[in-house]
Structure formats: C-alpha cells, structure tokens
Amino acid sequence: MLILISPAKTLDYQSPLATTRYTQPELLDHSQQLIQQARQLSAPQISRLMGISDKLADLNATRFHDWQPHFTPDNARQAILAFKGDVYTGLQAETFNDADFDFAQQHLRMLSGLYGVLRPLDLMQPYRLEMGIRLENPRGKDLYQFWGDIITDKLNEALEAQGDRVVVNLASEEYFKSVKPKKLNAELIKPVFLDEKNGKFKVVSFYAKKARGLMSRFIIENRLTKPEQLTAFDREGYFFDEETSTKDELVFKRYEQ
C-alpha cells in the first residue's frame, strides 16, 4: 500500500529531529533544472507568480539562489520533519519511532513541485514551488508538463518494490493532478472526510487536511497493507460511512462537536 500526501507551505528547520537517519531525493537532476528556471525570476516576478507578499517573495528568491544539490544534515532536513502544515499536524511524524519511520519510508510518498516525489527520510532544502504554479520551463508551460510521466514512473517503482498494487490518495487535487492514474499500476482508493456543519456533512478544508494526516498516521502505526483495513479508521471522532462509500471512495464522517 502506497500513501500519497501533499507537501506544506509552512516549513520547520528549527525543531529537534526525531531521527538522524536520512536518504537522498531520487529526482534531484530534475529539481536542479527547475531551480535554474526559478533563479531567472526577480522577487517581484515571484510575488506575482505565486500570489505572495514581497517579504515572502524575497525569502524564496534567496532560497532559490542558495539551493545547491549536495544535501547534508547541515544544510537540509528530512522532508517528513520539514513540512509543517495541517496534514503534518495530523501526521505528527516528530513522535514516530524507528519502526514507524521504516514503514513510512516504504509506504508513504510526498508529492512536490520542486522534488517530484519525496520519501519521508529524503533530505530537502527549503523551497516554495507549488505544483499548480505556471512556471514556464523547457518542457512546457507549467509543472505538470515539466514532470510529465516522471512522478507516475517513480510511484510505479515504489509499488513494484513493495509488491502490492494499492495507492491511497490522501493528496490534494492540485498535487494528485501530477499523477497519471491510467499509467499507475495500482488500484486507487480515495478517503474523503466530511464534517457536520449546521446539520449537513461537507468537506471543511482545515479539518479534511488534518484528517489526511491522521489517516496516514493510522496506516503507519498499525502497519496496514490491505484496503479493507482502512474502514476501521476512527481517530478524533471520524467514523466510516458504508452507505455513501464506494469501492474506490471511502467516506468518513464526523458529527459537529
């Protein structure tokens, strides 16, 4: 079973590390090409392209400039411990033990605009380059064209290595668009998290993101390998709703607190 999650805009390079183990990202040659492209942008261009403040644009222009492909624990950090958004609040990788990291390294992948695909222990230098950004590059008009089949091929390699054919899609639409489902050698399962609001169940972005992290942690902690095991997910008040679920879309609901 391979779990896919999105990266986060918020990064943490200060907190104590839960592990000293690390690996190197596998697609750095491609990342380097994107960095060369991004370095041609001025801070005001970055601000317009990404829709961010001048201060953030300056920070990211500096990050692009400082980025260099020789990653060490001194200039980079394991991806699963560097990302700090809502998904990662639910995941709480900072509390993983060695066996959790082992399972995650085999079964969890983070999709990334700059790095393509990251394993949890892959070192990563700080960046901001969201998958949906229209950064023109030698391969096309945006990052989807840049990555083409590369991300899908890398996921197929991971599936081959672990010997099963199930992908649990816990990534956002923006990021999952970088995967070619028809070329993926796997059964696709998408958990959906609905929260009750004024008597109606709907996707509430903040809660849904955190729930994706909670589900990822649930799979890792319990070493789950079969799709039918996912329906037991019951963290923080969620329950499986068999009636509205299908074989490839598992619906989890939570009553208003």
UniProtKB/Swiss-Prot annotation:
<dbReference type="GO" id="GO:0033194">
    <property type="term" value="P:response to hydroperoxide"/>
</dbReference>
<dbReference type="InterPro" id="IPR005583">
    <property type="entry name" value="YaaA"/>
</dbReference>
<dbReference type="GO" id="GO:0005829">
    <property type="term" value="C:cytosol"/>
</dbReference>
<protein>
    <recommendedName>
        <fullName>UPF0246 protein YaaA</fullName>
    </recommendedName>
</protein>
<dbReference type="Pfam" id="PF03883">
    <property type="entry name" value="H2O2_YaaD"/>
</dbReference>
<comment type="similarity">
    <text>Belongs to the UPF0246 family.</text>
</comment>
